[in-house]
Amino acid sequence: MCNTPTYCDLGKAAKDVFNKGYGFGMVKIDLKTKSCSGVMEFSTSGHAYTDTGKASGNLETKYKVRNYGLTFTQKWNTDNTLGTEISWENKLAEGLKLTLDTIFVPNTGKKSGKLKASYKRDCFSVGSNVDIDFSGPTIYGWAVLAFEGWLAGYQMSFDTAKSKLSQNNFALGYKAADFQLHTHVNDGTEFGGSIYQKVNEKIETSINLAWTAGSNNTRFGIAAKYMLDCRTSLSAKVNNASLIGLGYTQTLRPGVKLTLSALIDGKNFSAGGHKVGLGFELEA
């Protein structure tokens, strides 16, 4: 088993309590299906933003060649951007994944791509991404070490065109079955931390704190999720800007999920400007 998370997944449980079950200011529909054999997967989503009226959508198809560990993914969105991803996993070595990710914009002819590699084991995970740019690619790298529940991570990016580090981040945390602690420092100026607690089978809570050196702008938030039953959940969160988020998620039937959410400005309650959201998830 390769259970060590990537750098981006550190503190993920706390982030999920804050982010999942909400969709303020939009109507969203997600559709997912796959072939009987599981070799082909299809997904599409559409968003309509209530404040601007702008709509967007995307389509993704995925084809797996399991005997060779290959996965081919095609992506398209309403901005007419085409993406192709080819990944090869667990064949050269257990836990090793190699990926080629390309993007093409037909309207402008713009092309871009990345080469990605990651390797995960029980006590560590490492990875690197390289932009395909002959004028001077940017190299991204990260590493996470795990020991008896403790996690330490480092993330960097190096701009070869300017020969300097453009990102320099550190993280430290602790992970248990029902408790997670995560702290991070980005570029020596941005500090943050989060705490996740699974109180019982029905209640999850999270606290998030962040601040920037040389600034009085401190961000603080509390979030909670409560499972009414196996099909229904309530979510709530509030931050120090007096923004209150409420969410209701109901599984109407297997594969059909409804989400209702609202964002309330507590400082200007009578002035309006609040946002509501509606989401449908369909899976077959």
Curated annotation (Swiss-Prot):
Residues that bind NAD(+)? 243-245, 261-265
Q: Which Pfam families match?
A: Porin_3
Q: Where in the cell is it found?
A: Mitochondrion outer membrane; Membrane
Modified positions (Phosphothreonine) are 4
Query: Looking at the UniProt record for this protein, which Gene Ontology cellular component terms does it annotate, in alphabetical order?
Result: membrane; mitochondrial outer membrane; pore complex
Q: Which residues carry this modification: N-acetylcysteine?
A: 2
Please give the residue positions where the record annotates the modification Phosphoserine.
Answer: 242
Highest taxon of the source? Answer: Eukaryota
The UniProt entry's GO biological process terms, in alphabetical order, are: sperm mitochondrial sheath assembly; spermatogenesis
- Per UniProt, location of the Glycyl lysine isopeptide (Lys-Gly) (interchain with G-Cter in ubiquitin) cross-link in this chain: 54, 110-111, 267
Q: Where are the transmembrane segments?
A: 26-35, 39-48, 55-65, 70-77, 81-90, 96-105, 112-121, 124-131, 138-146, 151-159, 164-176, 179-186, 190-199, 203-212, 219-228, 232-239, 243-252, 255-264, 274-283
Q: Name one GO molecular function term.
A: nucleotide binding
- Write down the chemical reaction(s) this protein catalyses: chloride(in) = chloride(out); K(+)(in) = K(+)(out)
Question: Which keywords accompany this UniProt record?
Answer: Acetylation, Ion transport, Isopeptide bond, Membrane, Mitochondrion, Mitochondrion outer membrane, NAD, Nucleotide-binding, Phosphoprotein, Porin, Transmembrane, Transmembrane beta strand, Transport, Ubl conjugation
Residues that the record marks as modified (N6-acetyllysine) are 12, 15, 20, 91, 267
What does the PTM comment of the record read?
Answer: Ubiquitinated by PRKN during mitophagy, leading to its degradation and enhancement of mitophagy. Deubiquitinated by USP30.
Q: Which coarse location class applies to the principal site listed for this UniProt protein? A: mitochondrion
- UniProt free text on domains: Consists mainly of a membrane-spanning beta-barrel formed by 19 beta-strands.
Say what the protein does.
Answer: Non-selective voltage-gated ion channel that mediates the transport of anions and cations through the mitochondrion outer membrane and plasma membrane. Forms a high-conducting channel with a stable open state and a voltage-induced closure with a mild preference for anions over cations. Involved in male fertility and sperm mitochondrial sheath formation.
Q: Which PANTHER family match?
A: VOLTAGE-DEPENDENT ANION-SELECTIVE CHANNEL, VOLTAGE-DEPENDENT ANION-SELECTIVE CHANNEL PROTEIN 3
Q: How is the subunit organization of this protein annotated in UniProt?
A: Interacts with ARMC12 in a TBC1D21-dependent manner. Interacts with MISFA.
The family line of this record is: Belongs to the eukaryotic mitochondrial porin family.
Q: What is this protein called?
A: Non-selective voltage-gated ion channel VDAC3
Species: Pongo abelii (Sumatran orangutan)
